[in-house]
Amino acid sequence: MSADEVNIDTASLEELRDILINKTGNTKLANRFRALFNLKSVGSEDSDKERAHKAIKYIAECFNDDSELLKHEVAYVLGQTKDLYAAPYLREVLENDNQQCMVRHEAAEALGALGDKESLPLLEKYFKEDPLLEIRQTCELAIERIHWENSEKAKNEVLEKSLYTSIDPAPPLATNDSTSKVEKLKEILNDQDKPLFERYRAMFRLRDIGTDEACLALASGFDDPSALFKHEIAYVFGQMCNPVTVPSLIKVLKDESEAGMVRHEAAEALGSIATDECLPVLQSFLNDSEPVVRDSAIVALDMYEYENSNELEYATVK
């Protein structure tokens, strides 16, 4: 039986691992993503810790792959497990200069999501020394997130209950009169003199407000010079699934001068939103010269088919 014939929803952990790492050499990328999400489900939710840790170990085996898109998703998933067992795998990726920038960035962000205090010296090192701005900025955010999570301030802040279950690079700004005003949040979002962590907090507060006005305020962030910042806005749009964001996402995806990490996130967001105008746009990028954009279009179209079929979720756990 080939990997693509295995029922991913009933597969054993070992079968899921073999699909994820493409043991046969001919497994569809979309199926590898589905296997990843199902392993994540076990790694983050299984009450049997030995089984959960086995799933995490199997997920981390994929860091030897060539696909930048898949490896960055692997790092993201490990950060969402809430299990420090994943931290050594992520530290190793951050330290490996042979890994692509997008993968190393996601590993650093995942260490922040795990709240891993033991990783602070490593994050400080790369915040100060890494030649890549995206890595330095990610480490800055991860450091701030870990400090915030372990602070008195975090205990006393009133955060509105979010619709989203993701562990984000920064918490939304605390709820008060000024953070309920979209215009004020837009100012913070776009103020390059403010700390990046505070700007991200405004970003996630706008996401949680979720109105069309909030979406358009977020879209203004696509004018920022930071690829990291812009890719996070595209990611947030993929979570929100509000069709009002489609024109700005299409514009970003079509801009070949834009960083691959931003364009790929725009493609995935369009796949999540999955309105009729998204389909031909995504199809036009199936042969893009940037591998991570091309792979994202493939996965996004697969997501599109799921969203427009009777399947309720892209995988067992999204």
UniProtKB/Swiss-Prot annotation:
One of its GO terms (biological process) is single-species biofilm formation on inanimate substrate. Binds 2 Fe(2+) ions per subunit. It catalyses: [eIF5A protein]-deoxyhypusine + AH2 + O2 = [eIF5A protein]-hypusine + A + H2O. Disulfide bonds: none annotated. Pathway: Protein modification; eIF5A hypusination. GO terms for molecular function: deoxyhypusine monooxygenase activity; metal ion binding. The keyword Cytoplasm applies. It is found in: Cytoplasm; Nucleus. HEAT-like PBS-type repeats lie at residues 70-96, 103-129, 262-288. Catalyzes the hydroxylation of the N(6)-(4-aminobutyl)-L-lysine intermediate to form hypusine, an essential post-translational modification only found in mature eIF-5A factor. This is Deoxyhypusine hydroxylase.
